[in-house]
């Protein structure tokens, strides 16, 4: 290598151009002269200091709007001036009964929280295989189903690729697509919230999108994708991600086993609703072997925590509790639906999930209704999207939560 000779930065050094490659005789030293800036050191330093951090951010993220999450108890408590136990939280579709008692016991008896978790979540996947009837080699666990949605996109989508979204639906699909630099083709649902299969087929043929996200039951309306519709979409040359976060409440069998015969199907599940583990973030998915291999390569190695795996395994050991809670929530859903039909300014939609979507009518403002109920300590979901303007969503709670909601609603009629 040559020796670089630097000149004083306040002057300009002029040198002859030298060949980029040459031989150097033994005991000879090559003198390389370079151009130096005539800008004073202090001024150049100030210019460098003016570079802001956002200069390093990927351009497509600079205008990304953050995901709008539901506020947790501690934040709501401060804002409303109420104790957490005095807030009726019907805005996030959480399981009000919480996990089986075995979960709390297992977490208290956890022996090795200081050891990294199993990267393959083998114990959990074995338990899920027994629970679902699908072999563990088709199953991958994640830090909530949300992590798996992002992982799928990172493995499937190049910047500029397209996905199909069918609003109104879970907004995480559109958000993660934006994070990954993909474009979203929206195929709105029919007025009854069913899928527009003909339009989906046209989009797949002409736009060649990589994947489509379907939720069954769909969030926020609680409608389901029947087998005939799903098979029609699976016949298209597109990867179908079926989100079954709420399938337990639908009375339908999960499609997890279908991944063995459909190479273009992924099925996602979660412990948040069924087992009351939303706060511990543990989800899972069923994948064709031709796809799951690459997700294993790309996923974070320690994505499912020791606590999450312990809790999920403990929950699966008490299927009777899980079944009883499901039955209780389905029964309360039907009672809540009938009560909401009696409210003169609400038009509820039948639901296969643990929530009910209502159209706000009779001149009542949906956003103000949500805000007024919040001041009374009852939280429901309101939407800003054009597809759901004038709608609210109510999660199914315990019977006493329903009573509190109905008591507050009576203030308006």
Curated annotation (Swiss-Prot):
Give the UniProt keywords, A-Z.
Amino-acid biosynthesis, Aminotransferase, Chloroplast, Histidine biosynthesis, Plastid, Pyridoxal phosphate, Transferase, Transit peptide
Which InterPro entries does the record associate with it? Answer: Aminotransferase_I/II_large (IPR004839), HisP_aminotrans (IPR005861), PyrdxlP-dep_Trfase (IPR015424), PyrdxlP-dep_Trfase_major (IPR015421), PyrdxlP-dep_Trfase_small (IPR015422)
Q: Which GO terms describe its cellular component?
A: chloroplast
**Which biological processes are named by the entry's GO terms?**
L-histidine biosynthetic process
Read off the PANTHER family from this record: HISTIDINOL-PHOSPHATE AMINOTRANSFERASE, HISTIDINOL-PHOSPHATE AMINOTRANSFERASE-RELATED
The source's domain of life comes to Eukaryota
Specify the transit peptide boundaries.
Answer: 1-35
What does the organism's lineage look like at the top?
Eukaryota, Viridiplantae, Streptophyta, Embryophyta, Tracheophyta
- What does the subunit comment say? Homodimer.
Q: Pathway listed for it?
A: Amino-acid biosynthesis; L-histidine biosynthesis; L-histidine from 5-phospho-alpha-D-ribose 1-diphosphate: step 7/9
Similarity field: Belongs to the class-II pyridoxal-phosphate-dependent aminotransferase family. Histidinol-phosphate aminotransferase subfamily.
The record's principal subcellular location, in a coarse class, is plastid
One GO molecular-function entry: histidinol-phosphate transaminase activity
Per the UniProt record, the source organism is Nicotiana tabacum
Name the chain's protein: Histidinol-phosphate aminotransferase, chloroplastic
- List where in the cell it is found: Plastid, Chloroplast
SUPFAM superfamilies in the record, alphabetically? PLP-dependent transferases
Keyword Chloroplast applies: yes
